Amino acid sequence: MKFTLIGNGRMGQQVAHIINNSSAHSIAAILDVDATITPEVFHGSDAIIDFTVRHAFLENLPAMVASGVPIVVGTTGWDDVQADVRQQIAAANTSLLYSANFSLGVNIFMRIVREAARMIEPFSHFDIALTEQHHTGKADFPSGTALRTAQMVLAANSRKTSIVRELADGNKLTPNELHVASLRLGTIFGKHSAFIDSETDDIEISHTAKSRSGFAAGAVEAAAWLALRHTTAPGFYTMDDFLDEKLGK
């Protein structure tokens, strides 16, 4: 398959490296984040892979949608306009797959945490909290992956109804609040953890990224999946949909 890449930063370069070393895929074009995008630039591509920034993604979205080529988006920070993006995708009868993290390992981690949160729900003496660690260059916190994991915990455990990102001096957590703590240090690629605690024992579930290659490989695999899915069932997808199909659910 042929992919057009938008964004030539660290993730974009890693995606290009994965594709260039693949016998099954090739690069149709690599577009810089500041490039002028028209629908025509995507002709001949089986899918678009976007790793840019919020403003660039939203500015380029109309051209991507108009091209009719399925879109894979790793750009984060646009959850507040996701309803509008979904509407654009539906109106054009095209396809978009979005994930804050394409690593297969971290998506498996999130499912394990969701199941753990569900299992402790009947036992009030168990509590749960999340942490995420990244390099100092990462601007957003908590990470999109941590927030997605937190949302999955809230959906699985009715005892948790809201997310707390920071604690002000003197404030205490209430039992219904899920604490999501962030750390920025050095060159950490990314570590996400769930801590489950009780008076008698504790459980820790963690995922540690060793490099960006896992994120990039997952994005390429998701793009190939979406390109095939688009022909029969266009729509807005996430890595949950990708994994559900792979797992036969």
UniProtKB/Swiss-Prot annotation:
InterPro entries the UniProt entry points to: DapB_C, DapB_N, DHDPR_bac, NAD(P)-bd_dom_sf
GO molecular-function term, one example from the UniProt record: 4-hydroxy-tetrahydrodipicolinate reductase
GO BP: diaminopimelate biosynthetic process; lysine biosynthetic process via diaminopimelate
Subcellular location: Cytoplasm
Annotated catalysed reactions: (S)-2,3,4,5-tetrahydrodipicolinate + NAD(+) + H2O = (2S,4S)-4-hydroxy-2,3,4,5-tetrahydrodipicolinate + NADH + H(+); (S)-2,3,4,5-tetrahydrodipicolinate + NADP(+) + H2O = (2S,4S)-4-hydroxy-2,3,4,5-tetrahydrodipicolinate + NADPH + H(+)
Annotated pathway: Amino-acid biosynthesis; L-lysine biosynthesis via DAP pathway; (S)-tetrahydrodipicolinate from L-aspartate: step 4/4
This protein's record includes keyword NAD: yes
Catalytic residue list: H134 (proton donor/acceptor), K138 (proton donor)
GO annotations of cellular component type: cytosol
Main location: cytoplasm
EC number: 1.17.1.8
Positions contributing to NAD(+) binding: D32, G74, T75, T76, S99, A100, N101, F102
Binding site for (S)-2,3,4,5-tetrahydrodipicolinate: H135, G144, T145
Enzyme class: oxidoreductase
Keywords for this protein: Amino-acid biosynthesis, Cytoplasm, Diaminopimelate biosynthesis, Lysine biosynthesis, NAD, NADP, Oxidoreductase
Function: Catalyzes the conversion of 4-hydroxy-tetrahydrodipicolinate (HTPA) to tetrahydrodipicolinate.
Similarity section: Belongs to the DapB family.
Protein name: 4-hydroxy-tetrahydrodipicolinate reductase
Gene: dapB
